[in-house]
């Protein structure tokens, strides 16, 4: 009976031991359970199994909701941001980057200490001390010497010592990465980067978890946790960008008929795994034009019919990969011994190489080609695109200056005659810019009503003289076509109209004076001279006429009377 009680007590004690046993990495970092066969298949080079023990004395474990998280950092909480260049093709490298975001006004200096930013210290009402954590000043040289009792804290959670590269004393953060039942430890500053090779990983989504610890005396306390999903794929990650001239919206997958579409294939390969591989592109545009095979990642194609088409692209390449296991040699089936030949054939007694078992040859070839095996990888892209009619071309046919009834030196009006091909536009926009067509000065848009010939006249005003870049854009629901031209506006003098009027008046006045003078000269030159005759009647008449003219001119030409003394005597009767 006593022996039975002793056995039961031993079993109860053994059952209680795991509750007090040391924690393992998987207990601290995550709760995903991975079978042993998955751990062996997904083995990461340089990583360790999360079945190892965790040094809880040097790295305390805080669960979610623990009140100690609030006091883990001075001035607030530290946020860890985890990113990756996922998805990754099997065999390539995938990189994870963790960046620490400190509370407001805090940053890491060149020595690895955490300091306050000068520009916002006064806003927080801080003291004159610039440091949040001054780790380098608080450590003695003896703390960094390996093998001493004072350097026992310079270890990772699995009790492995820190590496000692140049400048490692400035690294005050410990990053523990955990995925696929394995962990990786790294010492760093406010950012850490880890790359893993995916050659042995299973395709599918996986989770990466990172826990960050900071120095706290001779221990390390957690300050942040973060996790992110990454994807391992056995298909080449492919994306295709489609662009077309005059297409109004590149993201709606609606394109124009009779204009080439540029297809550009983008392969997501951040680790340059496919740089040395020949890649072929097989296109099927869905318009019964056949299959196009190209080695170039860009291709142009023009649809000549309206409608909806299914685009299919297959990308193929060969990448290095493990060789398949050798096929086991199959022993020949048992058969009855053949009847002896009538005469012995010595040549059959020695087996020729062609009669050797195939297993030997397969094993030999497998060993030789084990380093040169390649695996075909494929990538696929599919899209449904719609082809419609649109505005194909816009051109300026004529530019004319608009005559102004009243001179306006500040503005100049110009008429532009614009034509287009294709669909009928619904809107016309004009952008007036500087001569480089970079800085817009004026933009005017208005609806237009165009007939079937697509001919319209646009009048625009220009502020002052100079050279302008004029951009005309005609658009409808699916297309947007444009054309540009340079135009020079000559200068105008504000006083030029008044000066022109004055010039005309002066010219008219000068012409009138000239005509008058010429008329007088011609009159004097051609005036006929008639002497006084002996006829008494004529004499009396002439004398009376002279007397009458003399009396009439007397009030107007008094000064000239002395020049004609004969007229001063009164007429007398002889």
Curated annotation (Swiss-Prot):
Residues 1-22 form the signal peptide. One of its GO terms (biological process) is negative regulation of T cell proliferation. GO terms for molecular function: heparin binding; integrin binding; receptor ligand activity; syndecan binding. GO terms for cellular component: cytoplasmic vesicle; early endosome membrane; melanosome membrane; plasma membrane. It is a single-pass type I membrane protein. Residues 320-353 are annotated as: Disordered. It is found in: Cell membrane; Melanosome membrane; Early endosome membrane. A motif (Cell attachment site) lies at residues 558-560. Residues 321-345 have a biased composition (Pro residues). Keywords: Cell membrane, Endosome, Glycoprotein, Membrane, Phosphoprotein, Signal, Transmembrane, Transmembrane helix. Belongs to the PMEL/NMB family. PANTHER family: MELANOCYTE PROTEIN PMEL 17-RELATED, TRANSMEMBRANE GLYCOPROTEIN NMB. This is Transmembrane glycoprotein NMB. The gene is Gpnmb.
């Amino acid at each position: 009976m006593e022996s039975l009680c002793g056995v039961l007590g031993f079993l109860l004690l053994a059952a209680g031991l795991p509750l007090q046993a040391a924690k393992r990495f998987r207990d601290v970092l995550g709760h995903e359970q991975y079978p042993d066969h998955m751990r062996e298949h997904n083995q990461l080079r340089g990583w360790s199994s999360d079945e190892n023990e965790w040094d809880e004395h040097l790295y305390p474990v805080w669960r979610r909701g623990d009140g100690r998280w609030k006091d883990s950092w001075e001035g607030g909480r530290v946020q860890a941001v985890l990113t990756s260049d996922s998805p990754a093709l099997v065999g390539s490298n995938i990189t994870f980057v963790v960046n620490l975001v400190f509370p407001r006004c805090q940053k890491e200096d060149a020595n690895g200490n955490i300091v306050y930013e000068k520009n916002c210290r006064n806003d927080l009402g801080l003291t004159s001390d610039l440091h949040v954590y001054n780790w380098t000043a608080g450590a003695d040289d003896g703390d960094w010497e390996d093998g001493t009792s004072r350097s026992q804290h310079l270890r990772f959670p699995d009790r492995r010592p820190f590496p000692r590269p140049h400048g490692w004393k400035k690294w005050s953060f410990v990053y523990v990465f955990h995925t696929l039942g394995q962990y990786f430890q790294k010492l760093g500053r406010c950012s850490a980067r880890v790359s893993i090779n995916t050659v042995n990983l299973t395709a599918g989504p996986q989770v990466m978890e990172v826990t960050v610890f900071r120095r706290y005396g001779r221990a390390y306390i957690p300050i942040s946790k973060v996790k992110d999903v990454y994807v391992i794929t056995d298909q080449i990650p492919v994306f295709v960008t489609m662009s077309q001239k005059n297409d109004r919206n590149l993201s709606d997958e609606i394109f124009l008929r009779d204009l080439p579409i540029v297809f550009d294939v983008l392969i997501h390969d951040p680790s340059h795994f496919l740089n040395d591989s020949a890649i072929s592109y097989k296109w099927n545009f869905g318009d019964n034009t056949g299959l196009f095979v190209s080695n170039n990642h860009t291709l142009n194609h023009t649809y000549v019919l309206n409608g909806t088409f299914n685009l299919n692209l297959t990308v193929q390449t060969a990448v290095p990969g493990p060789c398949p296991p050798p096929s086991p040699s199959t022993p020949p089936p048992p058969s009855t011994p053949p009847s002896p030949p009538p005469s012995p054939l010595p040549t059959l007694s020695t087996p020729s190489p062609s009669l050797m078992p195939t297993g030997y040859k397969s094993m030999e070839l497998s060993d030789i080609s084990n380093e040169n095996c390649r695996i075909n990888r494929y990538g696929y892209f599919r899209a449904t695109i719609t082809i419609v009619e649109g505005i194909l071309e816009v051109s300026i046919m004529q530019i004319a200056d608009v005559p102004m009834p009243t001179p306006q030196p500040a503005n100049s009006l110009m008429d532009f005659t614009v034509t287009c091909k294709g669909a009928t536009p619904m809107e016309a926009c004009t952008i007036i810019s500087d001569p480089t067509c970079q800085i817009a000065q004026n933009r005017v848009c208005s609806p237009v009503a165009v007939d079937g010939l697509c001919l319209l006249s646009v009048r625009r005003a220009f502020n002052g003289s100079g050279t302008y870049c004029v951009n005309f854009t005609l658009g409808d629901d699916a297309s947007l076509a444009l054309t540009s031209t340079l135009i020079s506006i000559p200068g105008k003098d504000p006083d030029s109209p008044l000066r022109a009027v004055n010039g005309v008046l002066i010219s008219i006045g000068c012409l009138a004076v000239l005509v008058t003078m010429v008329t007088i000269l011609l009159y004097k030159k051609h005036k006929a001279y008639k002497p006084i005759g002996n006829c008494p009647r004529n004499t009396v008449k002439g004398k009376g006429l002279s007397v009458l003219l003399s009396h009439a001119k007397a009030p107007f030409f008094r000064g000239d009377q002395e020049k004609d003394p004969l007229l001063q005597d009164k007429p007398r009767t002889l």
